[in-house]
């Protein structure tokens, strides 16, 4: 499927079609596919320099690291870290940094270093309408071919995205979605929704009920670098999520019914998505109160501005080491590859379809020998306390508490 996508894009560019859009489920190799397209087009000298844009610095770093693995003997530069290497063949940047660089980085004669013709191709990581609205000046300035990447399901991509990429009849250049990856090719694992002991009541509003302006507003929250602006929940949600009994039952649900580590003594690698930083800290504090035997090591906080967030995340990536649970708001939604994750807890209300898909994507990756020699990861489970699946009109397979085993 990656080869098919690479072939279609390269053929389009050769024909003079300047815009391509790839829809690929999280975990199926969007970055690797993009790197292959860049490699083919630059080695054939059909394209010169390339710009890779992402909306967060963590994703910029991850993309550059991935390209290094896939493309040999090509100069690369993370513009956020080293503007001195700006002559590189491939530049990686956030939208904000590039927008600033266009005006501020100059040649010796005072002219702009990044001229309109500097790049032959711009790769847009997670292409969606908020990006084009907020940073359209970049795409208006550079005269380059475009390659859009998105994990958003084809039938939920906004019309304006298709229009931006000149997709006739709303048909992307190539599509490879979660269902095909799971059911046909088995390159991702399925998930099951666990019936939880408590859920917040709501007004029955779904994503389909939102008008375009409301959807636009929610998706726009997802564009900022360094962390998404936290949605301020209604008072009723605040009262619910900061309730000791609610959080204690949520933790109990996870510890009793989550997929367990191969040792059978406790749950496997887990991400809890909290509503905001205060809520995340509240969950960690309640866990430590309920399980003092772990001495604060089992469940850790991974949020922006937390001094030990980086180390906690590094430790979380170690398959058999503490912590086994990380509590986050936005840091672990995208760009974090931990195949050992078997449990996701949605303790936050999500209004962005993009964010929802990326949160789910944290659990979809295959993992060999996770439960011992020859016993691979076959599934993961999701605990949803905020009716997010109902909001997005998703009806996945469910299980009652107690059905899940290692």
Residues covered by each model-derived region:
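ATP-dependent helicase/translocase motor core
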Residues: 1-49, 58, 62-73, 87-90, ...
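Conserved RecA-like helicase motor-core motifs
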Residues: 21, 49-51, 64, 71-83, ...
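Conserved RecA-like ASCE P-loop NTPase motor core of nucleic-acid helicases/translocases
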Residues: 21-23, 48-56, 268-276
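Conserved helix/coil segment N-terminal to the catalytic DExD/H
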Residues: 81-90, 96-117, 136
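Conserved C-terminal RecA-like helicase domain
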Residues: 89, 228-328
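SF2 helicase catalytic motif II
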Residues: 96, 110-148
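Conserved RecA-like P-loop NTPase helicase motor core
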Residues: 96-99, 121, 299-403
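Interdomain helical connector at the RecA1-RecA2 junction of SF1/SF2 helicase-like NTPases
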Residues: 159-267
């Amino acid at each position: 499927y990656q080869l098919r996508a690479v072939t279609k894009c390269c053929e389009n560019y050769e024909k003079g079609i300047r815009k391509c859009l790839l829809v690929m489920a999280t975990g199926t190799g969007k970055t690797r596919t993009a790197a292959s397209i860049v490699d083919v087009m630059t080695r054939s000298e059909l394209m010169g320099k390339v710009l890779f844009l992402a909306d967060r610095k963590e994703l910029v770093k991850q993309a550059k690291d991935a390209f290094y693995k896939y493309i040999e003997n090509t100069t690369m530069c993370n513009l956020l870290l080293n503007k001195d290497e700006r002559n590189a063949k491939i530049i990686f940047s956030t939208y904000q940094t590039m927008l600033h660089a266009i005006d501020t980085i100059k040649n010796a004669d005072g002219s702009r270093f990044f001229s309109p013709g500097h790049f032959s191709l711009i790769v847009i990581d997670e292409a969606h309408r908020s990006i084009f609205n907020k940073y359209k000046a970049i795409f208006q300035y550079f005269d380059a071919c475009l390659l859009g990447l998105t994990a958003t399901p084809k039938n939920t991509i906004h019309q304006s995205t298709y229009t931006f990429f000149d997709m006739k009849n709303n048909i992307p250049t190539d599509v490879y979605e979660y269902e095909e990856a799971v059911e046909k090719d088995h390159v991702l694992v399925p998930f099951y929704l666990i019936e939880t002991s408590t859920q917040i009541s709501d007004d029955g509003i779904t994503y389909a009920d939102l008008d375009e302006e409301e959807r636009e507003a929610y998706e726009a929250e997802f564009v900022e670098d360094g962390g998404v602006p936290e949605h301020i929940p209604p008072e009723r949600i605040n009262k619910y999520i900061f309730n000791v009994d609610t959080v204690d039952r949520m933790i109990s649900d996870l510890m009793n019914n989550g997929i367990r580590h191969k040792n059978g003594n406790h749950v496997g690698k887990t991400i809890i998505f909290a509503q905001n930083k205060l809520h995340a800290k509240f969950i960690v504090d309640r866990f430590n109160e309920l399980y003092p035997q772990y001495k604060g090591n089992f469940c850790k906080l991974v949020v922006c501005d937390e001094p030990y967030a980086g180390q906690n995340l590094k430790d979380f990536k170690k398959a058999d080491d503490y912590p086994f649970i990380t509590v986050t708001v936005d840091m672990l939604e995208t760009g974090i590859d931990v195949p050992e994750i078997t449990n996701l807890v949605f303790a936050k209300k999500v209004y962005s379809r993009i964010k929802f898909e990326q949160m789910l994507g944290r659990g979809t990756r295959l993992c060999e020998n996770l439960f011992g020699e020859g016993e691979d990861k076959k599934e993961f489970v999701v605990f949803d306390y905020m009716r997010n699946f109902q909001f997005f009109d998703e009806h996945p397979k469910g299980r009652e508490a107690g059905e899940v085993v290692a």
